[in-house]
Amino acid sequence: MTEMTPTPTLDELPRRFSDFDTLGDALDYAAQGKRGFNFHDARGTLARAYPFRELREDALAAARRLIVAGIKPGDRVALIADTEPQFCALFFGAVYAGALPVPLPLPTSFGGRESYIDQIGVQLDSCDPAILLFPDEIAELAGAAGQSRAIAAYGWDDFGGQDAPDTPLPTANSGDIAYLQYSSGSTRFPHGVAVSHRALLHNLGSHAHGMLINDTDRCISWLPFYHDMGLVGCFLSMVANQVSTDFLKTADFARRPLSWLDLITRNPGTSCSFSPTFGYEICARRIGSQSNVQERFDLSRWRLAGNGADMIRPDVMQRFTDAFAPAGFDAKAFLPSYGLAEATLAVTLMPSGEGMEVELVEETELSGEKRSDGSRPKRFRAIVNCGKPVRDTLLEIRAENGAVLAEKTVGKVWMKGPAVMEGYYGDQEATDACLVDGWLDTGDMGYLSNGYLYIVGRAKDMIIINGKNHWPQDIEWAVEQLPGFKAGDIAAFAITTPGGEETPAVLVQCRTSDEIERLRLWNEIREKVRAITGMNCVIELVPPRTLPRTSSGKLSRAKARNLYLSGDIQPYAVAA
């Protein structure tokens, strides 16, 4: 059996940094070269090399099938986004047909059949697609979701077997909407972010320049295509900037996370690979105290280790560095960033090669509380530098009344630039609430220092007790300092007591069935949180795998709060 050859890193085709009018133009150009995508199985073995030339051929055929099926320019094409060549071809097929591809999440292990159908259903209601296309492996679930909304639904194989006769393709303009992107938290009231070709390609060029992409770079990714970092950063960007990419399915990464590092090791050139903090944490935990790190891995050519999509945890990144430094990993490769789907993707990037920088900020500066008189010890929090704005992007930190705040003052992060979304699809009210005079309210809290952005947390997650601001991450971090607890095991949020007072509640996933041990843990958690944060919190121990997550794997504090208050999360009884 002949060994499959991956698409090359080097190519004679001159690189263009996303300077195209439309996404279709970008693929037309990339297809003239030899680079492309490479899909790997759970063990990291190459299963399919997919040059951009083949992707374009398949996408044009998919476009013709869509047009024959009655799809018109502006129609929405819902795509369940698995990491497969078929998804890539269908996404670009929709683009060539003038339709709007709408990536939707795969089922996860959280929740059951009805939960998934409900989640997909509300997103289908929101985007009102003309067709739903899905991997054949989930035909029962996806078909039921389509049937519940009377939407024509086809498996990829079934649709791919239909005729694709020659038919004229529409001409796109740079101001047209290219696709809709649902943010990872948009389940109950989803907002489809409408991104134009112009905004997309400007952002793709901006972050390619910011990362100093060069001829020896190759991307390695396990990120899902239904999340903005995976879709925009590791799929569309690689086409528009002509970068060969090695893909590992998200589910395969979850089962065998070190396969990600195996792929980076095997890349003879320089690697650019991105992950939220939890990806680095899983790898550091999995390698544990193994002594063969340097024998299995060579991470010395990992040029950019991007981090974003969630709060960046410096303690986790340090553990990853300690675990993999023997394999040649250089902490200067870390590339902290900040972005959101409403800004296409990238808003800020740390300059390449500067690594991760952290500021220790006193609690009163984050909470807005008056400085202490020295009667209690100061408490500090490590805040990660998320870099400088990408080109043509402006940032302001604003108070609640809209006033622009000085440097090193925490407030709401607002941004303006050519990559800001057109709006939320079909929801003018929500659009008007966050887009004001061309400025986007990101919903995040942070501050500026010497032109660099520091993110403190989500405004909606803030816990306000007696007029003082508290960040749930600080409370959760306190619990994580105890043995046996990790990020994702804890959710902190505000509740109202029977007496009408606001107080923090802390849900902690507990793996022991011994009631005496639970009581010991309950007391230990309560005392640890009090010692670190100074707060008395309602501590609730809950069963494992209870805390809800978004489709991209992030903890959903808002959903956890709703489930707790509705009684759907039942804590263990602890005899305090």
Predicted segment positions?
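AMP-binding/adenylate-forming catalytic core of the ANL superfamily
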Residues: 265, 273, 284, 417, ...
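Conserved C-terminal "lid"/linker of ANL adenylate-forming enzymes
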Residues: 489, 493-494, 505-506, 526-576
